[in-house]
Amino acid sequence: MYYFYWLPVGTDVRVRTTPWVTLSIVLTNLFVHGVFLASRGDAGTLYALAFKAAQPTVATALASLFLHAGFLHLVGNLVFLSVFGPPLEARLGPARFLIAYLACGWLSNLAQAAAILAWWPELVSVPIVGASGAISGLMGLFLVRLYFARLRFVSVTLLYFQGIAKPAAFSLPSIVGIGLWLALTLAYQFAGVASETAYIAHLSGALFGVVFGLVMGLAPEARLERHLAMGSRYAERGEWFAALGEYESYLAKAPADPEALAQAARLQRVTHQEGQSAVRFREAIRQYLRQGDTRSACDLYEEMRRLLGGEVVLPSGDQLRVARGLEELGRPSEASRAYEAYGKRYADRHLGTLAMLKSADIQRRVLNNPGRARYIYEELARRPLSGDVEAIVRDRLAASERAVERLHRGAA
């Protein structure tokens, strides 16, 4: 006897936010199931809350989404929800995601009830419970919004008579994985396998999910994000020019995405397009600063400096904001270097002089590096300065020289 069990366990798409709605649905399902376990399976209450074709109501159609026939039924649904929920919630937003989830579940229960009334009237009083219709709706939405993704699966092949149990892990394109699931569901429906399972709810839920995805305009978003996914896959395989082409296509429609700009800059560096790489790095940093993400801007500035070498300088305002950001983030060495780069690039400006002073002060007071501070003060002293500024520079230069002498005497 041969059995093959498979279960999705993840996707290759990024989730950048905490999926609060998905977590809330998971916890609500667990709480409701725990309450019924604590009440030792109150069948009367469960039956009253469950959706039935003979007595279809909006309230029971929604309540049934949080009721399950048993622990395995619950766990199976929550596994699917945990795979498909977070990436969709991150892209649809909490409100649209919750509405789509509940609507697919409600409509799929109505579809199951209609099928029972039409073809299996003897089942009109059998309760319909479970979140399968809603989760099937998420799978339909996934086909529209994230059709380019890959799904990760685990499987177990059982050969009972031979005593063999073989686990495996594999991945499939989402269209193939979900398509196989739909095909099996359809086959089970016609074959009458596990007839107590609401296969019509599964199939109709997926259909409603596809319809909702198209109505919400998710297809254009999907085509755009596909460029990022393909670019990432090409880059992982070392196909740099193909990857860069995908990012270029994406940026043609979303030119202000700092992460895509940064990735394109890295690819241009790898393909020896240093000039274009610098332009893209600078634009990515500017976009991070506009978004108020100073940490990412500072990190990318340092990455740009390492990859491109030399004196990396941003436009005036951006360079100062990055220098201040590095200082506020507790990275004094990098901040001093950024201030110094500004001071050298914009030497003819008053702010350039102040930036050099700031750089030297960080070296002297924070990093306890009077030698480096002296070098910067000496460079400043060679510039034409106003009387007050020149006096400050001379005074701090003298203090640095004394500190260097003390270090030398201590070393001796």
Q: Could you tell me what each predicted segment is?
A:
Residues 225, 242, 259, 279, ...:
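Start-of-helix register in tetratricopeptide repeats
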Residues 227-228, 261, 281, 301, ...:
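TPR repeat positional signature
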Residues 230, 264, 283-284, 322, ...:
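Structural register within alpha-helical repeat arrays
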Residues 237, 271, 291, 329, ...:
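Structural motif corresponding to the intra-repeat A-B loop/turn of tetratricopeptide repeats
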Residues 250-257, 290-291, 307-314, 342-352, ...:
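Short solvent-exposed coil/turn linkers within tandem alpha-helical repeat scaffolds
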